[in-house]
Amino acid sequence: MSEIRLFVTTTEKQAAAILDVMSVNFEEEGYAVATMEIDEKRDVWEASVYMMADEEESVKSRLADALAADFSHLPIEREVLPEIDWIAKSLEGLAPVRAGRFVVHGSHDRDKVKTGEIAIEIDAGQAFGTGHHGTTAGCLEMLACVARSRRVRNVLDLGTGSGVLAIAAWKLLHVPGLATDIDPVATRVASDNARRNGVVDGLTFATAPGFHSTAFGTHGPFDLVIANILARPLMKMAPELVAHIAPGGSVILSGILAEQRWKVLAAYNGQRLKHVQTIWKNGWVTIHLTK
């Protein structure tokens, strides 16, 4: 599904004021907002809010209402953001990524794996997650921390993407796991990656558009849930996600910008989860909480 940018073009001063309006109305729900300079000499700026395509109509209506009092004369414009193969892009010229004992590498870098490292081979494909992004690397580091301190008997990787986190959990813990994604392409890619990494038993892959999927009930509740998604869906799904965590279990949350951390924490503290640790990487955070 495409991502949409709704934006208003104006001066720097007005863009800052509009950003404040956007922040008040959308940031708490996890929408990203931003300003950018377009033309320094002419003082042209854009204030933007980002959402998925199926949310555009609702967000645009709310934005128009929020801007009506002071900025109704400024039109709301839209841009459909390009769908980029981030896997291929992230692997261009990048060395293997090391996070704790894990090393995530492409097939061209197999010879760079050191003795004692847990190697995960992920090549360019159609699903997100090569370890180069701060969220994936943060999850790998946090997974190692959880494994050292808590007993884990089964794992859920929610929004598995390339399958890198599910594969990492299996290689480290050797316990049954369920890896789900709303995208059937991602599910297929993740399953293929698991086989390529020698994981032929113990991991189940399922396309699951929501928690009503029977896969969650069949394989859960889970001692460890890993969800590297985005702040807004993480907050929205908090009650259902927590319901699938076993008593005393853990959840690793990522896909969260540093400034969104407190909002996500509030959503899960509201479900009576306790914060254990936060890892900060390149403007992103990975959070560990327990039930």
UniProtKB/Swiss-Prot annotation:
Listed EC numbers: 2.1.1.-
InterPro entries noted in UniProt: Ribosomal_L11_MeTrfase_PrmA (IPR050078), Ribosomal_PrmA_MeTrfase (IPR004498), SAM-dependent_MTases_sf (IPR029063)
GO terms for MF: protein-lysine N-methyltransferase activity
Top class in the EC scheme: transferase
Biological process, per Gene Ontology: methylation
GO cellular component, one term: cytoplasm
Annotated localization: Cytoplasm
Record keyword Plastid present: no
Binding site for S-adenosyl-L-methionine: T136, G159, D181, N228
Catalytic activity: L-lysyl-[protein] + 3 S-adenosyl-L-methionine = N(6),N(6),N(6)-trimethyl-L-lysyl-[protein] + 3 S-adenosyl-L-homocysteine + 3 H(+)
CDD domains found in the cross-reference section: AdoMet_MTases
Entry annotated with the keyword Cytoplasm: yes
Keywords (A to Z) from UniProt: Cytoplasm, Methyltransferase, S-adenosyl-L-methionine, Transferase
Pfam families per record: PrmA (PF06325)
HAMAP family according to UniProt: Methyltr_PrmA
Family: Belongs to the methyltransferase superfamily. PrmA family.
Function field: Methylates ribosomal protein L11.
Protein name, per record: Ribosomal protein L11 methyltransferase
Species, as recorded: Sinorhizobium fredii (strain NBRC 101917 / NGR234)
Gene field: prmA
